[in-house]
Design a protein with these regions (language model features):
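Membrane-anchoring hydrophobic helices of lipid-metabolizing enzymes
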Residues: 51-131
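A membrane-cytosol interface segment of integral membrane proteins
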Residues: 172-194, 199
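Short gly/ser/thr-rich secondary-structure transition/capping motifs
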Residues: 112-120, 181-184, 238-242
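Hydrophobic alpha-helical transmembrane segments in multi-pass membrane proteins
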Residues: 1-2, 27, 31, 73-77, ...
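Catalytic core of membrane glycerolipid acyltransferases/transacylases, capturing the structured
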Residues: 77-100, 127-182
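A cross-family acyltransferase "interaction/gating" segment
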Residues: 166-168, 198-201, 210-250
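Membrane-embedded transmembrane helical bundles of large multi-pass transporters/channels
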Residues: 1-53
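Residue-level preference for the first positions of well-ordered beta-strands
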Residues: 130-132, 197-203
Length: 250
């Protein structure tokens, strides 16, 4: 082919042959190095875990959602910093931040224009009275959904939520509780929050389900309901694990 023209003595043909040979070598290198790595990273590594392969659209949606979420967290931290020197009770400051989170999470979910959200509330629950709110746990998004539904609530969380560099400070400021402290020790502290009108959000499975199926419920939420004298308010979440799961967070 054109590569053979490298032996030609004509300068133009010699240059053309060199370019064609370099092109062939580049194509071979990409085919056996870059392309398999990208296929492994974007397709096979995800399908082996039971997830969907990454696409350009899914990556754009992820960056969009993550950007909105991080921006919201930064605004909340700025709000906390602004409220810090003001001469008002910490309880009132927490309530302002809680109200802001409730409306920001509602706005965040509405901004996810590629995801359809359906809420079924046949009983007309208003979440006005304190209760132990329990839900199945498929995704990190579950936390945002429940905070958007419950206008006044504290949550019992796992360690990774408590220590998150993005929103851990907000969680700690609001007085959310670490499940590792033990529900027996949490009950007296939560009683004070309940007296202030807060509900308590608990994921009885203890962690996110990797396959979307509801796992065994632990007894902590039910212990709290009995100790605090609260009704148990169950919420069933469906589809969040298809957007962001434990196996495939993005």
């Amino acid at each position: 082919g054109l590569g053979a023209l490298i032996f030609a003595r004509h300068p133009a043909l010699h240059s053309l042959a060199l370019i064609s040979l370099f092109g062939i070598v580049a194509v071979v290198l990409v085919s056996y190095t870059v392309q398999p790595v990208l296929f492994r990273m974007l397709v096979s590594s995800q399908t082996e875990k039971g997830g969907a392969p990454y696409t350009l659209g899914s990556l754009i949606n992820t960056l969009y959602a993550f950007g909105l979420f991080v921006t919201g967290c930064q605004l909340l931290q700025a709000l906390i910093f602004t409220l810090w020197p003001l001469p008002m009770a910490r309880r009132r400051k927490q309530r302002i931040v809680q109200w802001s989170i409730h409306h920001m999470t509602r706005g965040f979910l509405r901004a996810m224009v590629t995801t359809k959200t359906i809420r079924l509330n046949d009983t007309g629950e208003t979440f006005a009275e304190p209760a132990v709110v329990i839900a199945n746990h498929q995704s990190f998004i579950d936390i945002l959904v429940l905070l958007s539904i419950c206008p006044k609530a504290v949550m019992v969380t796992n360690g990774w939520v408590w220590r998150s560099p993005v929103f851990g400070r907000i969680v700690r400021y609001l007085g959310f509780y670490h499940a590792a402290d033990g529900y027996e020790r949490l009950a007296p502290a939560l009683a004070q929050k309940v007296a202030e009108g807060y509900s308590v959000i608990v994921f009885p499975e203890g962690t996110r389900s990797a396959d979307g199926r509801i796992k065994r419920f632990h007894k902590g939420a039910f212990y709290l309901a009995a100790e605090l004298g609260l009704d148990i308010l169950p919420i069933c979440l469906y589809g969040n694990g298809m957007i962001s799961s434990k196996r495939q967070p993005i």
